[in-house]
């Protein structure tokens, strides 16, 4: 039988902070089923590996017998979380929120156990809140407390606007914990303020305060900025297995250790042993293969993980071109499109500056020919096979815009 201390040690793995750890240990010792909450605003349709840092920790709680409250912030999502933002965020429409929420429900059970997961929508209690309820909720916090939050403080000091609804967001997120009577809440490090608001509100409403666990923000494929679809440095959990495998094989050796800690279910003792082996001369590529196969198997199956590994070996050791090259259509004027912009719009690079750097390094080929001209314009009407590095390919077609066609 696993002891409360052993459970705590496992839960602590990969976390940034556990507030308060002694309280969590006490609740584990009580042996009751904990209600473990994590909220996701469905502001984008696809979950990526960055989201699974939280999902994996939720799954860990489930494996120890606890219940997960997967909160879809369909109400708060229409406000938009201001955390880390230096400008007011544009709210999403209700229809877009619901469309994204449906895809979340389809994707989360690739990680979570559906038998131990309660999916809830915060519109269930927030849509019925009256003006009096909102005023009562707002009375539990002050503007001074809100300005303690770093992003609000910087905007205030810089005389940049802060909308009233942005002050409401942490209160509404915190009230979710009251409505759900959460014992534990998980969130990214950028969510710490909001999670603490939840603790404060639970106390104000006469409830036992939740334990807070913050998780690191996962770096994207570039190893610098956080994983984000908008930055193009992400791995979506619904992507084809070959794409997931190839992207993981492309990460740096340093980033590989970070991904192993936050994404892998391998014991830390095993990962530590691998580190020592690499220090003694073992090839880190072999460990990267293990990581890539594990992640593909998680979102597909073991057989598919073996298949994409074999395909990867064939492609990059024998110089084979992948069979399923993505087809990209770009609309441009008669002057065409600059090659650096084409690479970015085809999602082959994260930015035009990265495009220019890779061209300079000789890492870009068009129709098999290495490109050296950074200012090349690609004209409409022709389809090209574009390659960046060893494993990124796209079949790109440039089409004239309708306005240009009429001229």
Curated annotation (Swiss-Prot):
Q: Which SUPFAM superfamilies match?
A: Alpha-L RNA-binding motif, Nucleotidylyl transferase
**What is the residue range of the motif 'KMSKS' region?**
226-230
What this protein catalyses is: tRNA(Tyr) + L-tyrosine + ATP = L-tyrosyl-tRNA(Tyr) + AMP + diphosphate + H(+)
Q: Could you tell me the keywords of this UniProt record? A: Aminoacyl-tRNA synthetase, ATP-binding, Cytoplasm, Ligase, Nucleotide-binding, Protein biosynthesis, RNA-binding
A GO cellular component annotation in the UniProt record? cytosol
Q: Where is the short sequence motif 'HIGH' region located?
A: 42-51
> Does the keyword Transport feature in the UniProt annotation?
no
**Matching PROSITE patterns, A to Z?**
AA_TRNA_LIGASE_I, S4
Q: What InterPro entries is this protein classified in? A: aa-tRNA-synth_I_CS (IPR001412), aa-tRNA-synth_Ic (IPR002305), Rossmann-like_a/b/a_fold (IPR014729), S4_RNA-bd_sf (IPR036986), Tyr-tRNA-ligase (IPR002307), Tyr-tRNA-ligase_bac-type (IPR024088), Tyr-tRNA-ligase_bac_2 (IPR024108)
Among the GO molecular function terms of this UniProt record, one is:
RNA binding
Briefly, what is this protein's role?
A: Catalyzes the attachment of tyrosine to tRNA(Tyr) in a two-step reaction: tyrosine is first activated by ATP to form Tyr-AMP and then transferred to the acceptor end of tRNA(Tyr).
What family classification does the UniProt entry report for this protein? Belongs to the class-I aminoacyl-tRNA synthetase family. TyrS type 2 subfamily.
Describe its partners and assembly state.
Homodimer.
Q: What name does UniProt use for this protein?
A: Tyrosine--tRNA ligase
Say which species the protein is native to: Nitrosococcus oceani (strain ATCC 19707 / BCRC 17464 / JCM 30415 / NCIMB 11848 / C-107)
